[in-house]
């Protein structure tokens, strides 16, 4: 029913501006945070003048309020009277909240949001002007009383304060702004603490123009956070960064699909190299191109992209296929304008496709530590050779950032006028690779000494790659600060294929002693230590398939069967394969489904030789425990898991019903024979 809709962030801001207050159904002792309450539909709005009555009545009780907002005619003494629903519906439809929401939404779309600043002041009365120009320092409540405004709709008095260059500051230990002050006031008693800036992104609006079938892993372009010396007006105009102290009054509402990301958490704290210092100025210049946004987070806070201006170019964040991704639901009259208005020199729009953006995210200079200046295409040829040498030492394709080989890039930039920004050179029509140069041993050694650590490990210490399954990006994620365990194990597909590259294959080769390469040749000592630590974790931890196993045991004298239920989740057969991930999962699921269908549910193992042998084999195959009979060899990870396939399990399970525990006890020799048989099957 209409009256029971939950409130989203935009609705929340409109409700507050209309003088309504959020009322939660939870007692204050166990309040969860705002985002949780909204995502669980536990937040509703009621008129502010009734909140005190509600608080007195509901003290210490959890009371579910059925509706969002209420009119004057709703009887609070009898919450659920027979006519309550009808009254609410009438109130909502006849110029109530829905009307306010609709008007606010329409108005916001038609007029650009107004952000007050000293150069663009909000309209004030003469009395307010006098008070504001003489204002020194006072609490927010005092400020509101002085200018004659209510405290609750935040926007009006904040606009006034901003118009006259006043700043919001907080007392020591306060979580939100408490005072309004002018810049020349005595602020000695306020502790100067480092402000934390956060990126707020509203996915709903920014991806609305992509239709319903856009990629579910939505990554937004990185906009540099404001400098400490930026004025508050400039920061508000840039719009997408808010200070964490500004969370009072629920102005910034977090809900399920909002991401907060701190740029320093993403890039890690690293001393800037010379290349990065070169590239910092153009990036700061591009801050002026960031779209104006409102201070409140709302459905329409991110307007559709403006194609008439050059896009913000962030190094390594663009891809050639992104230029078409915005035009899916574009009205036909805009199509020609977009083509003619877009500057010919810009390579493409900011990338929205998740796979290519991930790829470019992980190949930018802070990830691979192969530094590329912003003026990439005009590299001298020697520098481009160094680049290809550095990436060749990983036995990978060349990671040179420019699409064209260095010679072509030099020619292209030479044809341009000298004042053209060389970062915007047109890419060559066909994708071409920079030529590979086979490095000599001396060059490799020099590279290794120069970099100390291999790029895929050095970068992992400085750049946070989420150590969770990529599936969790279906809903957006609040990115945590840099974790200590920067090498997640067993790792995601993203980590295996993109970041660690050949390292895992080498790790497997190191595990098999028969063909162990010389570690010095491939990896330096730090990397070897890391590999050994991770191998130790793998071989000594509980095998993944046993973590969820529940064993029903019965008294030994009773003759009933004890049953081992394998957990229903499908565990990955192999953590170290760099093959086609989806194909392997599909095969595994198919085999397992056939098994379960044929055996009528999960395989039931009866106690006895076969069951013990099979459990032993499963343990060994998952954990890779060294077996004395195999003369020091460890079971091969790939073989052991993939060969626990339909045929082998069939063979083992056929033994199960036949061999029960004999009354005189288990024959150890016979059990050893069974174990040897199982090992034989699993090791091929």
Curated annotation (Swiss-Prot):
Q: Where is the composition biased (Basic and acidic residues)?
A: 438-449
Q: Say which domain of life the source belongs to.
A: Viruses
Annotated spans, Disordered? 267-353, 388-449
Per UniProt, the ranges with Polar residues bias are 316-326
Name of the protein described by the UniProt record: Uncharacterized protein VP7
């Amino acid at each position: 029913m209409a009256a029971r809709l939950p409130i989203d962030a935009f609705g929340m801001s409109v409700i507050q501006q209309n003088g309504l207050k959020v009322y939660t159904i939870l007692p204050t002792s166990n309040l969860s945070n705002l985002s949780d309450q909204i995502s669980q539909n536990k937040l509703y709005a009621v008129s502010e003048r009734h909140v005190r009555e509600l608080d007195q009545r509901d003290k210490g009780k959890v009371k579910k309020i059925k509706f969002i907002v209420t009119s004057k005619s709703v009887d609070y003494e009898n919450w659920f009277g027979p006519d309550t629903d009808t009254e609410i519906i009438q109130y909502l439809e006849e110029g109530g909240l829905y009307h306010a929401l609709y008007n606010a939404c329409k108005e916001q779309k038609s007029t650009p949001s107004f952000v007050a600043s000293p150069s663009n002041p909000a309209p004030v009365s003469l009395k307010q002007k006098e008070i504001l120009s003489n204002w020194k320092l006072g609490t927010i409540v005092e400020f509101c009383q002085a200018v004659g405004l209510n405290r609750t709709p935040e926007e009006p008095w904040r606009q006034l304060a901003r118009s006259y260059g006043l700043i919001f500051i907080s007392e020591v230990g306060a979580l939100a702004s408490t005072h309004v002050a002018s810049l020349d006031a005595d602020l000695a008693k306020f502790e100067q603490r480092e402000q934390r800036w956060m990126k707020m992104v509203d996915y709903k609006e920014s991806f609305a123009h992509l239709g319903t079938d856009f990629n579910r892993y939505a990554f937004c372009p990185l906009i540099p956070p404001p400098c400490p010396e930026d004025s508050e007006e400039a920061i508000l105009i840039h719009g997408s960064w808010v200070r964490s102290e500004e969370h009072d009054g629920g102005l910034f509402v977090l809900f399920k699909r909002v991401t907060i990301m701190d740029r320093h958490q993403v890039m890690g704290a690293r001393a800037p190299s010379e290349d990065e210092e070169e590239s910092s100025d153009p990036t700061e210049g591009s801050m002026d191109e960031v779209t104006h946004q409102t201070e409140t987070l709302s459905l329409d806070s991110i307007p559709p992209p403006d194609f008439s201006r050059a896009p913000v170019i962030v190094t390594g964040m663009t891809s050639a296929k992104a230029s078409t991704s915005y035009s899916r639901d574009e009205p036909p009259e805009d199509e020609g304008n977009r083509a003619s208005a877009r500057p010919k020199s810009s390579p493409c729009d900011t990338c929205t496709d998740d796979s290519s953006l991930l790829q470019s995210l992980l190949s930018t200079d802070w990830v691979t530590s192969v530094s590329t200046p912003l003026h990439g295409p005009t590299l001298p040829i020697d520098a481009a050779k160094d680049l290809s040498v550095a990436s060749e030492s990983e036995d990978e394709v060349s990671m040179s950032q420019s699409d064209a080989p260095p010679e072509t890039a030099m020619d292209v930039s030479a044809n341009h006028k000298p004042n053209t920004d060389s970062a915007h050179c047109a890419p060559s029509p066909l994708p071409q690779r920079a030529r590979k140069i086979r490095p000599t041993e001396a060059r490799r050694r020099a590279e290794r000494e120069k970099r100390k650590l291999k790029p895929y490990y050095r970068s992992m210490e400085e750049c946070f790659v989420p150590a969770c399954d990529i599936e969790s990006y279906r809903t957006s994620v609040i990115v945590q600060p840099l974790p200590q365990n920067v090498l997640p194990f067993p790792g995601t597909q993203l980590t295996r294929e993109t970041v660690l590259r050949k390292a895992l294959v080498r790790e497997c080769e190191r595990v098999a002693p028969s063909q162990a390469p010389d570690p010095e040749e491939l990896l330096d000592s730090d990397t070897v230590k890391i590999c050994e630590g991770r191998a130790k974790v793998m071989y000594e931890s509980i095998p993944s398939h046993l973590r969820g196993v529940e064993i029903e045991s019965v008294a030994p004298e009773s003759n009933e069967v004890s049953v081992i239920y394998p957990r229903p989740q499908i565990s990955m057969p192999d953590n170290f394969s760099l093959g086609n991930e989806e194909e392997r999962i599909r095969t595994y699921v198919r085999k397992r489904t056939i098994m379960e269908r044929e055996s009528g549910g999960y395989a039931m193992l009866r106690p006895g030789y076969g069951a013990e042998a099979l459990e032993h084999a499963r343990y060994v195959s998952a954990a890779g425990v060294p077996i004395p009979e195999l003369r020091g060899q460890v079971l091969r990870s790939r073989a052991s898991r993939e060969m626990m396939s339909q045929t082998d399990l069939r063979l083992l399970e056929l033994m199960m019903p036949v061999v029960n525990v004999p009354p005189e006890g288990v024959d150890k020799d016979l059990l050893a024979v069974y174990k040897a048989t199982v090992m034989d099957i699993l090791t091929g």
